Each structure stands twice: as structure tokens, then as C-alpha cells.
């Protein structure tokens, strides 16, 4: 059966996430894509399960702040996404604590700082296992629940690096993993067509602190290659996550949204 048309017709209702339960992986930093995606969903009324790998204190702090500020239920969970059993347990625990999962934002990831000849095999595997296999693990774990409930929205954080090969830095493993995430979203949009929507978001250079190790001259070169001439703030991505999480995007599946300041048009 096709996914039904929402009953709401006004934008304020279509964008509302009141009564929805949203999982966001990788939301333990003070700012960052996952944290801002979670905040955006909380602003629109969603109850949240946010995850961390090693920064328990940061995740607990974010959960407390969002709950108090937006008046929603927020709980932090530990989950190492490259382990399927942990993703499965995460979904089961959230269902036990919240009753259901409506939206899963698969955001946890790892960057790379070298090419395949200068990296070890272990470094390659670590990026692929976290960024691509980790996304698969999350998707499968929640997809079974979506299929059972016959509803759901999966939003995958990919990257503009899934569309292009970045210059001048070498990061083949990351580029390959993120290209895989984009195509995984498209494949699942078809596979899950009867019960859930699947979309991806491909950010460009975002000022989250993850690229602080990159020399300033290289970062200046990046900016010269971006039509808008700057990095984005993570807050500039919130609207995209709320859109894909909500009924405002009810006829949208298999889409990838580039948010890169125009980088990929050059």
C-alpha cells in the first residue's frame, strides 16, 4: 500500500513534530550537525533519544538543556554504530522508554585525514565501518520497527564528499563511505516504499570543530572554492532535518539535499 497523504494541510501542522519520537545519533557535542538536528526537532515538539559514543557527559548535558528549554522528553543513550547489536539495542531501548520510533536521523560519523596509500588498512576500515556500515546498522535496526508500524522516516547524514573528491586534502575512505550513504538512502527509499521514507542530507564544510586540525591555508583555499565564501554554521542545517523528519516532506523520498554553499556547482 502507498504511504498515505497527511491529513494536515497547513505548514505549521505539517512541520510540527509534536507526539513524534526522534532518534539522533552523534549528538553529544556542544554544537555540531547531530546536536543542531536534535535541537531543531525539539523546537518543533519532538521527544528525543540522542546518542553518544564516548562523550557521555556532553550528551547528558545536551539532553538536560533541550528538555528544559523546549519542554520535551530527551534521553541520552550510548551507541557505537559500527556494532549492529548496539544499534539494535538502541532501538529496543527507545521503544521501551518512549513507546515507538517515528524518525531516525543517522548522523554519527568519522572523518579521514589521508589517502589510501598513506593510511593503514585499519584506518580505512574504521571510517568505512563507522560511516557506511554504521549507517546500514542503524537503518536495519530501525527499519524492522518501521515496517512493523508501517510508518517512519529515516534521514541519513551524508556529505558533499559523496558527490565530489575534495581538494587538496586526501580522504578517499570518507568520500567512498558518504557516496555509499547517498546510494543507500536511494536504495532504501525504493525498498521501503510501502511503509517509510528515506532521504539524505549532504552538508559541505561546516564549522563544527572537526576540521580544526586542517591548516589555515588549506581552509582558506576551501573558502575560495565555495561560491558563498565561508563555512556554514551547524544551525543552518536544522531546517533541512526538520523538513525531512516531518510531514512537510511527505512526498519526498530518495532525495539528497546538498547544503554546501554552492561548492558542487563549480
From Swiss-Prot:
Name the InterPro entries for this protein: NAD(P)-bd_dom_sf, SDR_fam
Q: Where in the cell is it found?
A: Vacuole
Query: Is Oxidoreductase among this UniProt entry's keywords?
Result: yes
Any Gene Ontology CC annotation: vacuole
Q: Which residues form a coiled coil?
A: none
Task: Note the superkingdom of the native organism.
Answer: Eukaryota
Record: residues binding NADP(+):
31, 33, 107, 140, 174, 178, 206, 208
What is stated as this protein's family in its record?
Belongs to the short-chain dehydrogenases/reductases (SDR) family.
Please list the GO terms describing molecular function. Answer: mannitol 2-dehydrogenase (NADP+) activity; NADP binding; oxidoreductase activity, acting on NAD(P)H, oxygen as acceptor
Catalysed reactions, as listed in the record: D-mannitol + NADP(+) = D-fructose + NADPH + H(+)
Task: Identify which residues the record assigns to the active site.
Answer: 159, 174, 178
Q: Per UniProt, which keywords does this protein have?
A: Allergen, NADP, Oxidoreductase, Vacuole
Q: What is this protein called?
A: NADP-dependent mannitol dehydrogenase
Subunit note: Homotetramer.
GO terms, biological process: mannitol metabolic process; protein homotetramerization
Q: What organism is listed for this UniProt entry?
A: Alternaria alternata
Amino acid at each position: 500500500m502507498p504511504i498515505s497523504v497527511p491529513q494536515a494541510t497547513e505548514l505549521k501542522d505539517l512541520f510540527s513534530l509534536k507526539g513524534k519520537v526522534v532518534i539522533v545519533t552523534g549528538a553529544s557535542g556542544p554544537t555540531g550537525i547531530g546536536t543542531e538536528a536534535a535541537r531543531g526537532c525539539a523546537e518543533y515538539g519532538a521527544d528525543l533519544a540522542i546518542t553518544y559514543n564516548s562523550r557521555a557527559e556532553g550528551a547528558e548535558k545536551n539532553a538536560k538543556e533541550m528538555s528544559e528549554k523546549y519542554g520535551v522528553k530527551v534521553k541520552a543513550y550510548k551507541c557505537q554504530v559500527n556494532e549492529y547489536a548496539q544499534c539494535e539495542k538502541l532501538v529496543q531501548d527507545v521503544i521501551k522508554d518512549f513507546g515507538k520510533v517515528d524518525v531516525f536521523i543517522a548522523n554519527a560519523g568519522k572523518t579521514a585525514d589521508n589517502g589510501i596509500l598513506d593510511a593503514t588498512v585499519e584506518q580505512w576500515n574504521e571510517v568505512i565501518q563507522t560511516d557506511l556500515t554504521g549507517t546500514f546498522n542503524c537503518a536495519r535496526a530501525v527499519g524492522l520497527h518501521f515496517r512493523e508500524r508501517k510508518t517512519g522516516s529515516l534521514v541519513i547524514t551524508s556529505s558533499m564528499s559523496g558527490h565530489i573528491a575534495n581538494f587538496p586534502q586526501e580522504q578517499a575512505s570518507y568520500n567512498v563511505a558518504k557516496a555509499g550513504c547517498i546510494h543507500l538512502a536511494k536504495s532504501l527509499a525504493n525498498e521501503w516504499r510501502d511503509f517509510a521514507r528515506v532521504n539524505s542530507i549532504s552538508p559541505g564544510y561546516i564549522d563544527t570543530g572537526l576540521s580544526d586540525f586542517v591548516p589555515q591555508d588549506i581552509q582558506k583555499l576551501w573558502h575560495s572554492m565555495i561560491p558563498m565564501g565561508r563555512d556554514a554554521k551547524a544551525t543552518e542545517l536544522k531546517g533541512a532535518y526538520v523538513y525531512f523528519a516531518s510531514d512537510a516532506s511527505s512526498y519526498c523520498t530518495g532525495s539528497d539535499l546538498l547544503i554546501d554553499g554552492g561548492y558542487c556547482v563549480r
